[in-house]
Every structure is written in structure tokens, then in C-alpha cells.
């Protein structure tokens, strides 16, 4: 599924054999480096903050990636834009679905307006 997502809309065949999980029954995961993977750190921060912050993080991320794909940002500016958007927002802890949609829309508009 990951390969299909990365090569969408085409379905590129892998030159490697499929992983047989009945044979490879043990996988090891390392703790992620949150300094290197700043967006993951920001996602953890949004979850820890709670309330409407995850919706803000999502909205900012969508705009940051879109702006990167348009050539408006460098890859390394993506987490900076997300962080600036999250820092500018006042979280609601009692919220409705409408509040989540508004938070996402606010973050999208704010992230679109930020200049580097």
C-alpha cells in the first residue's frame, strides 16, 4: 500500500520480493529523532495540547505542503510554517465539530498568509 501511495496514480511493480511476515515475525523500531523530524515533534505537541490544536496542525500542514509543491517554500520551511501557525492560534478546549472545521480553515488561511 505504501508503494502504491508513493507511485499514485500508477501502480509500479517492485523489483523486490514481497515481505513474508510469517517468516519475518520480528520487527524493531527505534525511537524517532524529534529534532530531525520536526513535523513529528509538532504533531506530538498538537496531540499533547489537545482541543482544536490537532485541526490547526492539520490545516497548516496541508498548506505548507501545497506551498512547497508550488515552489513557494523550501522543504525545510515546512515545519517552520506549521510551528508559526500553531504558535499564533488560541486553542479551544471545549469545542464542536464546527469549531474544528473553523480551526482548520483559520490555520489554512493563516499559513497561506505567512511570508518567509
Regions found by a protein language model. Name each.
Residues 1-116:
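Catalytic, metal-anchored helix/loop core of enzyme active sites in primary metabolism
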